[in-house]
């Protein structure tokens, strides 16, 4: 191998590393900013799902005045979402490369599989523990005398009462929701982006407004197809879920028999609001951060120079 070939190989390797780092940084920034803006809608969604209890024991607790209480459980959710978003984009890019042909092309089914893989990966590494902490904090705030002081206190209670496995309570419905959600969201976003790109003059870029709209539509599609899984996930992560439900299948049957089919879409409007906004924010910020990092990337400059 010539010195030039070695240089080109090293440049390509550095560029791949740079791409992964860019995805990681951009995903974290996009996820963190999205939660800071949209968390009150997540709080409302979770409260609505926890309030749906049938019969004489219906627990419709008065809503707190809008303010800091609407950010209860935000810190673990913010951390988890930032990590999750990074994992989602990095793993999605990785799975797409694995499923692509020799020319780098990937089918729509391949995009769907990459989305499922990204969802399962993010659920395992970030989502389930952070959402478990968030859910019990929000549920605790519904009590007349809340006992959980902060996120660290919530973690100590989970560890004390349930051990390490307590952080993964609701893992299967969470994984199902994340896998389906990522497949639908990323798949629909990629498809819609390809459609818009095909109608864009050659060499032209999709503008910020169009990117926001595409991301928002992808978020809206995701909500109504995955809301039943989200409702089951929330119920399975509440404080007394193990004694009340046992497992996700019993939980789903109980919701259907006691509350009716529509109960699976509890909080759908609030989640729609959040995911429509977050879909636009995440994809728009992600694309812009990646563009900015590409401008200052040494690997990018070397490749152009080569």
UniProtKB/Swiss-Prot annotation:
It holds the Pfam family Mito_carr. SUPFAM superfamilies: Mitochondrial carrier. The keyword Transport applies. Solcar repeats lie at residues 18-98, 109-195, 206-292. It is found in: Mitochondrion inner membrane. Its main location: mitochondrion. GO terms for cellular component: mitochondrial inner membrane. One of its GO terms (biological process) is fumonisin biosynthetic process. Keywords: Membrane, Mitochondrion, Mitochondrion inner membrane, Repeat, Transmembrane, Transmembrane helix, Transport. Pathway: Mycotoxin biosynthesis. Disruption phenotype: Produces fumonisins that lack one of the tricarballylic ester functions. Tricarboxylate transporter; part of the gene cluster that mediates the biosynthesis of fumonisins B1 (FB1), B2 (FB2), B3 (FB3), and B4 (FB4), which are carcinogenic mycotoxins. Within the pathway, FUM11 is involved the addition of the tricarballylic moieties to the carbon backbone. FUM11 makes a tricarboxylic acid precursor available for fumonisin biosynthesis via its export from the mitochondria. The biosynthesis starts with the FUM1-catalyzed carbon chain assembly from one molecule of acetyl-CoA, eight molecules of malonyl-CoA, and two molecules of methionine (in S-adenosyl form). PANTHER family: SUCCINATE/FUMARATE MITOCHONDRIAL TRANSPORTER-RELATED (PTHR45788), TRICARBOXYLATE TRANSPORT PROTEIN, MITOCHONDRIAL (PTHR45788:SF4). This is Tricarboxylate transporter FUM11. It comes from Gibberella moniliformis (strain M3125 / FGSC 7600). The gene is FUM11.
